[in-house]
């Protein structure tokens, strides 16, 4: 997997927003939560993820570079809110009322659960398979390789036929 280098100016913008939002939360909540670790190694179509045990946020470098300010304004507060909610409330629903409150009241950001960034550059290659009902099924590289090695078979949900690779 090719490593994507995030420009230093973008890293600085991410850090600035993270610190501003964390300071805002600490002031509102009368707490002193530490700055979380940031990693730029999130893969696939996920923009970011929060790891409570490590107090860490992982960001998708490709989506960050492609969406810059929109990414920073949406994803950084979103993932920070997950960490803050886990510390402040304990184990609760990931996008429940506590998270929504943290986003809208404490961080003063719109509580959106999903991003709407263009994912064409981070979408994995898929392979076309067919069944008896002529539906085309797209299998990921991992699933395709398992079929090719004879480790597994996949069936159509409708006709229950074993999927067959369409030779291109």
Curated annotation (Swiss-Prot):
Active-site residues, Swiss-Prot/TrEMBL: 79
A GO MF term: zinc ion binding
Residues binding Zn(2+): 78, 82
Subcellular location, principal: cytoplasm
UniProt key word Cytoplasm: yes
Gene Ontology cellular component list: cytoplasm
Needed co-factor(s): Zn(2+)
Family that this chain belongs to: Belongs to the SprT family.
Protein name as catalogued: Protein SprT
Organism, scientific name: Proteus mirabilis (strain HI4320)
Gene: sprT
